[in-house]
Regions:
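N-terminal secretory-pathway/extracellular module detecting exported/lumenal segments
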Residues: 75-77, 87, 94, 137, ...
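Short glycine-/aliphatic-rich beta-strand segments at the starts of folded cytosolic domains
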Residues: 2-13, 72-83
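Exposed alpha-helical structural elements
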Residues: 18, 48-49, 91, 123, ...
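Charged phosphate-binding loop/patch that engages nucleotide di/tri-phosphates or the phosphate backbone
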Residues: 150-171
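A hydrophobic alpha-helical transmembrane-helix feature that marks the membrane cores
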Residues: 2, 18-21, 149
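N-terminal first-folded block
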Residues: 17-21, 79-102
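Short, intrinsically disordered low-complexity segments
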Residues: 24-72, 99-148
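Short, charged/polar surface micro-motifs in flexible loops or helix N-caps
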Residues: 13-16, 85-86, 118-120
Length: 171
Protein backbone atom coordinates (compact mmCIF):
# COMPACT_ATOMS: atom_id res chain seq x y z
CA UNK A 1 0.00 0.00 0.00
CA UNK A 2 1.29 3.49 -0.85
CA UNK A 3 1.97 6.40 1.44
CA UNK A 4 -0.83 8.77 2.40
CA UNK A 5 -1.03 12.48 3.20
CA UNK A 6 -3.41 14.32 5.54
CA UNK A 7 -5.10 17.57 4.44
CA UNK A 8 -7.02 20.12 6.47
CA UNK A 9 -9.79 21.97 4.59
CA UNK A 10 -11.22 25.25 5.99
CA UNK A 11 -14.24 26.92 4.40
CA UNK A 12 -15.83 30.32 5.02
CA UNK A 13 -19.14 31.07 3.33
CA UNK A 14 -22.60 29.62 2.93
CA UNK A 15 -22.45 25.86 3.13
CA UNK A 16 -24.07 24.72 -0.12
CA UNK A 17 -25.16 21.34 -1.39
CA UNK A 18 -22.27 21.54 -3.90
CA UNK A 19 -19.69 21.96 -1.13
CA UNK A 20 -21.21 19.17 0.96
CA UNK A 21 -21.31 16.87 -2.07
CA UNK A 22 -17.67 17.70 -2.94
CA UNK A 23 -16.53 16.89 0.60
CA UNK A 24 -18.39 13.60 0.45
CA UNK A 25 -16.75 12.75 -2.91
CA UNK A 26 -13.32 13.46 -1.42
CA UNK A 27 -14.08 11.26 1.57
CA UNK A 28 -13.49 14.23 3.89
CA UNK A 29 -14.69 14.05 7.49
CA UNK A 30 -15.86 17.12 9.43
CA UNK A 31 -13.55 18.03 12.32
CA UNK A 32 -14.44 21.63 13.16
CA UNK A 33 -16.84 24.45 12.25
CA UNK A 34 -16.99 24.28 8.40
CA UNK A 35 -13.69 22.39 8.39
CA UNK A 36 -12.86 18.89 7.22
CA UNK A 37 -9.92 16.51 7.19
CA UNK A 38 -9.11 14.00 4.50
CA UNK A 39 -6.41 11.38 3.89
CA UNK A 40 -5.27 11.18 0.25
CA UNK A 41 -2.48 9.52 -1.72
CA UNK A 42 1.03 10.88 -1.08
CA UNK A 43 1.26 12.49 -4.54
CA UNK A 44 -1.71 14.83 -3.95
CA UNK A 45 -1.19 18.56 -3.38
CA UNK A 46 -3.27 21.44 -2.03
CA UNK A 47 -3.47 23.57 -5.22
CA UNK A 48 -5.29 21.00 -7.39
CA UNK A 49 -7.72 20.34 -4.53
CA UNK A 50 -8.49 24.08 -4.31
CA UNK A 51 -8.87 24.29 -8.09
CA UNK A 52 -11.40 21.44 -8.05
CA UNK A 53 -13.26 22.69 -4.95
CA UNK A 54 -13.71 26.25 -6.25
CA UNK A 55 -16.02 24.92 -8.96
CA UNK A 56 -18.38 23.84 -6.15
CA UNK A 57 -18.32 27.12 -4.18
CA UNK A 58 -20.30 30.36 -4.24
CA UNK A 59 -18.42 33.32 -5.71
CA UNK A 60 -18.01 35.05 -2.33
CA UNK A 61 -16.87 31.96 -0.38
CA UNK A 62 -13.30 31.31 0.75
CA UNK A 63 -11.43 28.02 1.00
CA UNK A 64 -8.03 27.00 2.39
CA UNK A 65 -6.50 23.55 1.87
CA UNK A 66 -3.29 22.63 3.69
CA UNK A 67 -1.18 19.53 4.08
CA UNK A 68 -1.00 18.80 7.79
CA UNK A 69 2.37 18.42 9.48
CA UNK A 70 2.16 16.47 12.73
CA UNK A 71 5.61 17.29 14.11
CA UNK A 72 6.86 20.35 15.99
CA UNK A 73 9.17 20.95 13.01
CA UNK A 74 6.11 22.27 11.13
CA UNK A 75 6.40 25.07 8.56
CA UNK A 76 3.32 27.04 9.70
CA UNK A 77 0.55 27.05 12.28
CA UNK A 78 -3.06 27.00 11.14
CA UNK A 79 -5.37 28.63 13.69
CA UNK A 80 -9.14 28.69 13.19
CA UNK A 81 -11.98 29.78 15.43
CA UNK A 82 -15.73 29.76 14.99
CA UNK A 83 -17.65 33.00 14.42
CA UNK A 84 -20.15 33.44 17.22
CA UNK A 85 -22.23 36.58 16.58
CA UNK A 86 -21.40 39.33 19.07
CA UNK A 87 -18.30 37.57 20.45
CA UNK A 88 -15.12 39.61 20.91
CA UNK A 89 -12.12 37.76 19.48
CA UNK A 90 -9.70 40.69 19.99
CA UNK A 91 -7.70 39.08 22.81
CA UNK A 92 -7.38 35.83 20.84
CA UNK A 93 -6.28 37.67 17.68
CA UNK A 94 -3.65 39.60 19.68
CA UNK A 95 -2.25 36.32 21.03
CA UNK A 96 -2.18 34.75 17.54
CA UNK A 97 -0.24 37.78 16.26
CA UNK A 98 2.33 37.30 19.05
CA UNK A 99 3.05 33.75 17.82
CA UNK A 100 4.86 35.01 14.72
CA UNK A 101 4.24 36.54 11.31
CA UNK A 102 0.61 36.34 10.20
CA UNK A 103 0.24 35.62 6.49
CA UNK A 104 -2.28 38.08 5.04
CA UNK A 105 -5.30 36.07 3.93
CA UNK A 106 -8.90 37.07 3.13
CA UNK A 107 -10.39 35.06 6.00
CA UNK A 108 -12.25 36.23 9.12
CA UNK A 109 -11.58 33.25 11.36
CA UNK A 110 -8.63 31.42 9.78
CA UNK A 111 -4.98 32.39 10.29
CA UNK A 112 -1.74 30.99 8.90
CA UNK A 113 1.19 31.90 11.13
CA UNK A 114 4.88 31.59 10.29
CA UNK A 115 6.27 30.93 13.76
CA UNK A 116 9.49 29.79 15.39
CA UNK A 117 7.47 28.58 18.39
CA UNK A 118 7.84 24.78 18.53
CA UNK A 119 5.34 24.17 21.31
CA UNK A 120 3.12 21.21 20.44
CA UNK A 121 -0.22 22.20 18.90
CA UNK A 122 -2.26 20.63 21.71
CA UNK A 123 -0.59 22.89 24.29
CA UNK A 124 -0.92 25.94 22.01
CA UNK A 125 -4.57 25.11 21.43
CA UNK A 126 -5.27 24.86 25.16
CA UNK A 127 -3.55 28.21 25.84
CA UNK A 128 -5.26 30.01 22.95
CA UNK A 129 -8.56 28.37 23.83
CA UNK A 130 -8.50 30.21 27.16
CA UNK A 131 -8.68 33.47 25.16
CA UNK A 132 -11.40 32.30 22.78
CA UNK A 133 -14.79 33.71 23.89
CA UNK A 134 -16.75 30.64 22.78
CA UNK A 135 -14.02 28.03 23.47
CA UNK A 136 -14.29 26.82 19.88
CA UNK A 137 -10.77 26.77 18.44
CA UNK A 138 -8.61 24.57 16.21
CA UNK A 139 -4.80 24.73 16.03
CA UNK A 140 -2.73 22.45 13.81
CA UNK A 141 0.67 22.41 12.15
CA UNK A 142 0.82 22.61 8.36
CA UNK A 143 3.57 22.16 5.79
CA UNK A 144 4.54 24.51 2.97
CA UNK A 145 1.96 22.73 0.74
CA UNK A 146 -1.11 24.95 1.11
CA UNK A 147 -3.35 27.01 -1.12
CA UNK A 148 -6.48 29.11 -0.87
CA UNK A 149 -9.30 30.50 -2.97
CA UNK A 150 -11.10 33.81 -2.49
CA UNK A 151 -13.95 33.94 -4.98
CA UNK A 152 -12.62 33.09 -8.43
CA UNK A 153 -8.95 33.78 -7.62
CA UNK A 154 -6.79 30.97 -6.26
CA UNK A 155 -3.29 31.26 -4.86
CA UNK A 156 -0.79 28.65 -3.79
CA UNK A 157 2.01 29.12 -1.30
CA UNK A 158 5.46 29.14 -2.90
CA UNK A 159 7.98 27.69 -0.47
CA UNK A 160 11.03 29.32 -2.05
CA UNK A 161 9.74 32.87 -1.50
CA UNK A 162 12.14 35.02 0.51
CA UNK A 163 9.50 37.34 1.96
CA UNK A 164 5.78 37.21 2.65
CA UNK A 165 4.93 39.54 -0.27
CA UNK A 166 6.39 37.13 -2.85
CA UNK A 167 4.91 34.07 -1.23
CA UNK A 168 2.02 33.26 -3.60
CA UNK A 169 1.44 32.24 -7.19
CA UNK A 170 -2.01 32.60 -8.75
CA UNK A 171 -3.52 29.64 -10.58
Amino acid sequence: MGEIKHFQICYEGDLTVGVSHAMRRLGAEPNFDQSWQVWLAEGRHAAPLVRWMRTQMDADARLLVASTQFTTARDFLLVRHSLTPGADYGELHDAVHRLGVIVELPFESTFVVQSDDRTDVQTLGLALGELCPDASLMVTGISHDWAYCDGGVSRMHVAAAEDLAGMFREF
